């Protein structure tokens, strides 16, 4: 598989594809993903992303920014920086266990020790507006009302853009919820006459509980353990959560169990996937094949749930095993 195909694989959006294709053949491509350490991660963070990035780590330099300062601003783990750092070690261990062994793991607190970082921060801030920063607050799951009570939240989008510039990356990875920050970085880069970062946006996984309305997306969140599969969950936990999950028949959109099959298992399991169907065994060799079979009713929700729980337990096992013996009571 060519590099550009690996980048496009299992992505919701690439901004822009033309910019991405111009990077092909470049020998020293640098990329990053920023993750807030905030406790025990769920599968969208610590299974999907490390496996995605592991596929390109031989071709591209990958940096995982353990965004401890960002998590502190966002009041993750009550803003306790020591506890956030412990959460960052959990991220590093799980990412490496899931295959991302060649990445550089960098702390935001190391970046901010540099006066050059803060010079870039000020240069970046001078090329943005308060209105644009407010529009970017959803990247941290916040809004203007939250920021009015805590001014530090206004710094967050500018810090994220500064991270991109300071690390001098060609490519930024993240969920669709990071789009505002990446677009802000591209706009400010144009004003600075510097390279625009290629923004690669992955899918967000829906809450296992489903969404009340199709236009009201609720993502999987570790703050609600019953909405998410955590990397510490054992087989019985995974089975219980998947069996209780929203999974309407013949509907893949807004179906969290179908999303796990489409965005984690089929792209990254790496083995043949066979599932019981109404007309016999179905080989799920592509997302398109799964979509068609499920929407036609050839795969029943109960069979899908059984297959997803079984394979997901296997895929979570490396991350789960990497945390054995650690005291995780502070994150329960």
From Swiss-Prot:
Q: Does the keyword Methyltransferase apply?
A: no
Transmembrane region(s): none
Q: Which GO terms describe its biological process?
A: tyrosyl-tRNA aminoacylation
* Residues engaged in binding L-tyrosine: 32, 156, 160, 163, 178
**What top-level class of enzyme does the UniProt entry assign?**
ligase
In which residues does the motif 'KMSKS' region occur? 219-223
In terms of InterPro entries, this protein maps to: aa-tRNA-synth_Ic, Rossmann-like_a/b/a_fold, Tyr-tRNA-ligase, Tyr-tRNA-ligase_4, Tyr-tRNA-ligase_arc/euk-type, Tyr-tRNA_synthase
Q: Which GO terms describe its cellular component?
A: cytoplasm
Q: Which residues form a coiled coil?
A: none
**Reaction(s) catalysed by this chain's protein:** tRNA(Tyr) + L-tyrosine + ATP = L-tyrosyl-tRNA(Tyr) + AMP + diphosphate + H(+)
Q: Which UniProt keywords apply?
A: Aminoacyl-tRNA synthetase, ATP-binding, Cytoplasm, Ligase, Nucleotide-binding, Protein biosynthesis
Q: Where does ATP bind?
A: 222
Q: Give GO MF terms, alphabetically.
A: ATP binding; tyrosine-tRNA ligase activity
Q: Name its cellular compartments.
A: Cytoplasm
Q: What is its EC number?
A: 6.1.1.1
> Which HAMAP family does UniProt cross-reference here?
Tyr_tRNA_synth_type4
Write out the similarity annotation.
Answer: Belongs to the class-I aminoacyl-tRNA synthetase family. TyrS type 4 subfamily.
Subunit composition and interactions: Homodimer.
Known role: Catalyzes the attachment of tyrosine to tRNA(Tyr) in a two-step reaction: tyrosine is first activated by ATP to form Tyr-AMP and then transferred to the acceptor end of tRNA(Tyr).
- What's the name of the protein? Tyrosine--tRNA ligase
- Lineage, broadest ranks: Archaea, Methanobacteriati, Thermoplasmatota, Thermoplasmata, Thermoplasmatales
Gene name tied to this protein? tyrS
């Amino acid at each position: 598989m060519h590099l550009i195909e690996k980048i496009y694989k299992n992505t919701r959006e690439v901004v822009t594809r033309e910019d991405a294709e111009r990077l092909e053949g470049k020998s020293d491509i640098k990329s990053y993903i920023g993750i807030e350490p905030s406790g025990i991660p769920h599968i969208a963070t610590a299974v999907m992303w490390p496996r995605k990035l592991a596929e390109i780590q031989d071709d591209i330099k990958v940096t995982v920014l353990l965004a401890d300062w960002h998590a502190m601003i966002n009041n993750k783990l009550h803003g306790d920086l020591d506890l956030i750092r412990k959460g960052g070690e959990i991220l590093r261990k799980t990412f490496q266990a899931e295959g991302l062994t060649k990445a550089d793991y960098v702390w935001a607190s190391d970046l901010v020790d540099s006066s050059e970082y803060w010079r870039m921060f000020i240069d970046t801030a001078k090329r943005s507006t308060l209105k644009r920063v407010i529009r970017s607050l959803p990247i941290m799951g916040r809004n203007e009302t939250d920021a009015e009570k805590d001014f530090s939240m206004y710094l967050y989008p500018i810090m994220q853009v500064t991270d991109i510039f300071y690390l001098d990356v060609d490519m930024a990875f993240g969920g669709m919820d990071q789009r505002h920050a990446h677009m802000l970085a591209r706009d400010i880069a144009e004003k600075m006459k510097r390279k625009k970062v290629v923004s690669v946006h992955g899918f967000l996984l829906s809450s296992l509980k489903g969404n009340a309305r199709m236009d009201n997306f609720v993502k999987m969140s570790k703050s609600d353990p019953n909405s998410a599969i955590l990397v510490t969950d054992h087989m019985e936990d995974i089975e219980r959560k998947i069996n209780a999950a929203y999974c309407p028949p013949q509907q893949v959109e807004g179906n969290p169990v179908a999303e796990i099959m489409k965005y984690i298992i089929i792209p990254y399991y790496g083995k043949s996937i066979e599932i019981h169907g109404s007309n016999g065994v179905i080989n799920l060799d592509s997302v398109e094949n799964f979509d068609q079979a499920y929407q036609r009713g050839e795969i029943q929700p109960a069979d899908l749930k059984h297959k997803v729980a079984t394979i997901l337990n296997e895929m979570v096992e490396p991350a789960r095993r990497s945390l054995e013996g650690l005291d995780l009571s502070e994150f329960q």
